[in-house]
Amino acid sequence: MSITCQCPLAEALPKIPNASCPVSFGQIQKVAFQRLRNSTGKANEFTAEAAITKKASWTELLTAQDATKIVVSPYINSPADSGGDARTTSGGNDDLGGVATIIGSEPIQFTGSLRAIDQSIVKAMKELICEANAGNLGVFLFDENGNIEAIQDETTKTTYRPIPIRSFFVADKVHGNYDAKDSNAIQWSYQPNYSDNLAIMKPEDFNPLTDLVNAE
């Protein structure tokens, strides 16, 4: 994504909030997938009335039979994010004084491993590849403490949406043989600036790792 700067610049530098406490998400252990929008283009979201912190709100979406449906992944091992580097001009003689200019940022790529998983689960998850290719797939992240990470609406702070992802992929099985378990690689990409409105929530009456189960 390219950086678009206001021109002319504002009268003063932007206000930067003061840090009051550290904020860090834990190890990503599971995720929930949901379409970003329904067939009419309306965004899928949790609201004050259907709170993201209440199990009942999730149960309704897990059992849904329409575009609001949510599905939960198996446990994901070896979760890792990479990328997000600055995109720059080439520097050298192409730039004044040889100093490169920042023109944007690279996407963040998530990778993980599904270990000892029934391949019927993997087969079903591969259908999500087309959902992501259509630009209509998002995830909610669950850490080892049962916290949830999602996109918070800038105006209505009680509204939360899935994190948009692209380039979703689940690989075929790699046999672990003697020293390891069989595994399937999983990956997707977040678009630049995806985390600008990212928020962490603690559920009130459930643990998403153990209490959210896909409908049969």
Region spans (language model):
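Polar/charged alpha-helical tracts
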Residues: 11, 60-63, 68, 123, ...
